[in-house]
From Swiss-Prot:
Annotated site residue numbers, Important for catalytic activity: H37, H258
InterPro entries listed in its UniProt record: THDP-binding, Transketo_C/PFOR_II, Transketolase-like, Transketolase-like_Pyr-bd, Transketolase_BS, Transketolase_C, Transketolase_CS, Transketolase_N
Gene that this sequence comes from: TKT
Catalytic activity: D-sedoheptulose 7-phosphate + D-glyceraldehyde 3-phosphate = aldehydo-D-ribose 5-phosphate + D-xylulose 5-phosphate
Record's protein name: Transketolase
One GO cellular component term noted in the UniProt record for this chain: endoplasmic reticulum membrane
Residues given in the record as substrate binding sites: H37, H258, R318, S345, H416, D424, R474
Highest classification ranks of the organism: Eukaryota, Metazoa, Chordata, Craniata, Vertebrata
Entry annotation: catalytic residues: E366
Cross-link (Glycyl lysine isopeptide (Lys-Gly) (interchain with G-Cter in SUMO2)): K352
Native source species: Pan troglodytes (Chimpanzee)
Reported function: Catalyzes the transfer of a two-carbon ketol group from a ketose donor to an aldose acceptor, via a covalent intermediate with the cofactor thiamine pyrophosphate.
Binding site for Mg(2+): D155, N185, L187
Keywords: Acetylation, Calcium, Isopeptide bond, Magnesium, Metal-binding, Phosphoprotein, Thiamine pyrophosphate, Transferase, Ubl conjugation
Length: 623
């Protein structure tokens, strides 16, 4: 254990005074807003005071400085006390706290990154610790810096499985630069938390997950100072026994006060009572950090060379992804890869082989994997690429949604999409993923159809802001592009055209190749079709689609290895809605599939070359 230097009585009293000022600010802000969670703030007041004004090292006027210690408020509903901390530190004006939750203020009801001191958005509970793990992993293994990471969790969110995924991850990777503080205030939103104040059980659970676990009185600044000063040979959990509404007579420890601001008259009485306990108005200055984090530049990362494929050769886009990522890894040591124990299927194992120190095995914990990536990406320290079966990203949709709210720049590659994976059956088939990722506000959705396009998608994703999703397929398909083909986000490609095309057919991945095969069948009948590769499903190349449709008598046929809802067909329909003389016909998977050979399943669900040819004939006959 490190030697513990007990703060003198003056410092301890100053920390107590700071905690009470944080309480007062939280109460004032929530009362002014008419909403918020003052009692949840009050249970954490001493924790926040000791953390920010005794333990943490940071530049108070530069919250995102790369050398600073990191803090994640996983119990995001306690945002007012986070804002109060930064006012106490001098970064925010005290008066700004009274604008909490106003549309004109950046002080949202829960933390968001438009605030310079917030790295990741929280409020959807159970996700903060995973992001903190990503920050700690980056600090220990990539930056090799001395900054530490602190995460404050509520006891209610400890029912979330994602918390324990993160606990396991931190232990496996020996994140001794990570401290989780559990604010055990006994009460959840509508009922007491399941373990209430059974502190020994919390301790045993943390220890079982490989953490150094310390029980403290969460309202004793001295005990907190001592706990934060303990040994750092493994991740540390400080299990703080606290009381919701601490310091408020008649409210402390009582149920039914969650998310309820105090009426003005009541707030004034409470504030007067708390204020009477403050002995000094003197503020504690933040301690600056050790400046040993390396300078990092992740802008404009480019492939070291063009693709090296040969037209006509066959490769699965999932394998092309692995090769492309490994190649991009040679362009920057800040390209990192994460996988959920599927690296031999997603082919991220190629990256691991070439860059073992930058590969993070997250095991079968997809929610945590996404949170880890978000943490790794904070402060522009890395460019993360996560991979697993596309179907399994659906489990992490809330984490992906919160990543968008966090303004995070992460890249997710989902393999094994659609019925074309074959015999493994419907549990492994991604048929909802396009709908899911299209709905995310900051997303770019790549759907490459050959090895060249896949390599370009990886390069573009590394340089595109927001959430990038790359959809890859299991079957091997022919290379259709030359290695020097230029690709851009939102730019589709015309793969096949003639002056007398009668229908525009839009497919991607496996179905693009089926469309090309259908074109060969139809050509024998003297029917020409135009074949489009959208490349990105979001954003969609509306202009090229409209131009092609107008050149083919207004007829568009979309074909996709995905359910009807939310996929390529609906994206195209939305793009052309209101345009006169244009009709869109959809071919897609229309029910829960089954096991079978890929060709059998494509035929069964009407998305193979024969179904496309038949649909084209039907459209022409209608005319």
């Amino acid at each position: 254990m490190e030697s513990y230097h007990k703060p003198d009585q003056q410092k301890l009293q100053a920390l107590k005074d700071t905690a009470n000022r944080l309480r007062i600010s939280s109460i004032q802000a929530t009362t002014a807003a008419g909403s918020g969670h003052p009692t949840s703030c009050c249970s954490a007041a001493e924790i926040m005071a000791v953390l920010f004004f005794h333990t943490m090292r940071y530049k108070s006027q530069d919250p995102r400085n790369p050398h600073n210690d990191r803090f994640v408020l996983s119990k995001g509903h306690a945002a007012p006390i986070l804002y109060a901390v930064w006012a106490e530190a001098g970064f925010l004006a005290e008066a700004e706290l009274l604008n909490l939750r106003k549309i004109s203020s950046d002080l949202d009801g829960h933390p968001v990154p438009k605030q310079a001191f917030t790295d990741v958005a929280t409020g959807s509970l159970g996700q903060g610790l995973g992001a903190a793990c990503g920050m700690a992993y980056t600090g220990k293994y990539f930056d090799k810096a001395s900054y530490r990471v602190y995460c404050l969790l509520g006891d209610g969110e400890l029912s979330e499985g994602s918390v324990w995924e993160a606990m396991a991850f931190a232990s496996i990777y020996k994140l001794d630069n990570l401290v989780a503080i559990l604010d055990i205030n006994r009460l959840g939103q509508s009922d007491p938390a399941p373990l209430q104040h059974q502190m020994d059980i919390y301790q045993k659970r943390c220890e079982a997950f490989g953490w150094h676990a310390i029980i403290v009185d969460g309202h004793s600044v001295e005990e907190l100072c001592k706990a934060f000063g303990q040994a750092k040979h493994q991740p540390t959990a400080i299990i703080a026994k606290t009381f919701k509404g601490r310091g408020i007579t008649g409210v402390e420890g009582k149920e039914s006060w969650h998310g309820k601001p105090f009426p003005k008259n009541m707030a004034e009485q409470i504030i007067q009572e708390i204020y009477s306990q403050i002995q000094s108005k003197k503020k504690i200055l933040a301690t600056p950090p050790q400046e040993d984090a390396p300078s990092v530049d992740i802008a404009n990362i480019r492939m070291p060379s063009l693709p090296s494929y040969k037209v006509g050769d066959k490769i699965a886009t999932r394998k092309a992804y692995g090769q492309a990522l490994a190649k991009l890894g040679h362009a920057s040591d800040r390209i990192i890869a994460l996988d959920g124990d599927t690296k031999n299927s997603t082919f991220s194992e190629i990256f691991k082989k070439e860059h073992p120190d930058r590969f993070i095995e997250c095991y079968i914990a997809e929610q945590n994997m996404v949170s880890i990536a978000v943490g790794c990406a904070t402060r522009n320290r890395t460019v993360p690429f996560c991979s697993t079966f596309a179907a399994f990203f659906t489990r992490a949709f809330d984490q992906i949604r919160m990543a968008a709210i966090s303004e995070s720049n992460i890249n997710l590659c989902g393999s094994h999409c659609g019925v074309s994976i074959g015999e493994d059956g419907p549990s492994q088939m991604a048929l909802e993923d396009l709908a899911m990722f299209r709905s995310v506000p900051t997303s770019t959705v790549f759907y490459p159809s050959d090895g060249v396009a896949t390599e370009k998608a990886v390069e573009l994703a590394a340089n595109t802001k927001g959430i990038c999703f790359i959809r890859t397929s299991r079957p091997e398909n022919a290379i259709i592009y030359n290695n020097n083909e230029d690709f851009q986000v939102g730019q589709a490609k015309v793969i096949l055209k003639s002056k007398d095309d009668q229908v525009t057919v839009i497919g991607a991945g496996v179905t693009l190749h089926e469309a090309l095969a259908a074109a060969e069948l139809l050509k024998k009948e003297k029917i020409n079709i135009r074949v489009l590769d959208p490349f990105t499903i979001k954003p969609l190349d509306r202009k090229l689609i409209l131009d092609s449709a107008r050149a083919t008598k207004g007829r568009i046929l979309t074909v996709e290895d995905h359910y009807y809802e939310g996929g390529i067909g609906e994206a195209v329909s939305s793009a052309v809605v209101g345009e006169p003389g244009i009709t869109v016909t959809h071919l897609a998977v229309n029910r829960v599939p089954r096991s079978g050979k890929p060709a059998e399943l494509l035929k069964m669900f009407g998305i193979d070359k024969d179904a496309i040819a038949q649909a084209v004939r039907g459209l022409i006959t209608k005319a």
